[in-house]
Structure formats: C-alpha cells, structure tokens
Amino acid sequence: MPPKFKRHLNDDDVTGSVKSERRNLLEDDSDEEEDFFLRGPSGPRFGPRNDKIKHVQNQVDEVIDVMQENITKVIERGERLDELQDKSESLSDNATAFSNRSKQLRRQMWWRGCKIKAIMALVAVILLLVIIILIVVKYRT
C-alpha cells in the first residue's frame, strides 16, 4: 500500500522550521473545512459519486496489488539470475581447470609413450648385439 500522509508530526519531521510553523502544524484543532477536505464529502447527495470513488479506489488497490506482485517477481527473478550467473561462472572455472588438466595429462602420456618406445628400441638393440656377439664367437672358434 502507498504511504499515507501523517496527520500528526514528530519533532524530527519539523526540525529547522520556524516556531510558529511548528506550532500550527502540531495543533490538534482543525476546522470543518479541513475535515471536509481530509475525509471527503458526506451526506445523501454524494452517494453515487462516493460509489464511483470507491470503485476507482478498488481498481487502484488492485493495480497496486498487481504492481507489488510484479515487483516481487522481478526481485525473485533477479535473485535467480544471480544464482544462475554464479553457477555459470563456477562452470566456466571448472571447464578451464579441466582443459588445463587435460593438456597436462596429454603431455604426460606423450612422454610415457616416448619412454616406452625408447625402452623397446634399447631392448631391440641389446638383442641384436647379443645375437651378433653369439654369431661372432661361434665363427671365431
């Protein structure tokens, strides 16, 4: 609901005002004309007009309720968007970490493959040397 105007003011509301203004604002006495403008007309001749005013006031109240619901929905949507943004940042960070780790693992596997190939080549060279030495020793004797 929209804020209503205060009929009685606190001292904090009127700080800095001239004393006569403060005294007039804080008086409890009000005349009939003031009451007429604050409360509206009353009596039988204002009946249909009063119904229209009530109808318009009801429509205004409905619009206010709808606007409050819309504001609540916008706030909730903003919160969900913030959560979604946090999750997407986290996902992006995880994707970057995964990419870096996969590159590191690829390098490790490449070196492991190189080591295995080097060991197999060394074993093949040793076998060839053993065979050659055996052949040389057999023909010398």
From Swiss-Prot:
Subcellular location, record wording: Golgi apparatus, trans-Golgi network membrane
Stretches in topological domain Cytoplasmic: 1-115
InterPro entries reported for this sequence: Synaptobrevin-like (IPR001388), V_SNARE_CC (IPR042855), VAMP4 (IPR042887)
Positions on the Vesicular side per record topology: 137-141
Keyword Signal: no
GO terms for biological process, alphabetical: cellular response to type II interferon; endocytic recycling; Golgi ribbon formation; Golgi to plasma membrane protein transport; regulation of Golgi to plasma membrane protein transport; SNARE complex assembly
Domain v-SNARE coiled-coil homology: 52-112
Keywords, comma-separated and alphabetical: Coiled coil, Golgi apparatus, Membrane, Phosphoprotein, Transmembrane, Transmembrane helix
Function: Involved in the pathway that functions to remove an inhibitor (probably synaptotagmin-4) of calcium-triggered exocytosis during the maturation of secretory granules. May be a marker for this sorting pathway that is critical for remodeling the secretory response of granule.
Name used for this protein in its record: Vesicle-associated membrane protein 4
Source organism of this protein record: Bos taurus (Bovine)
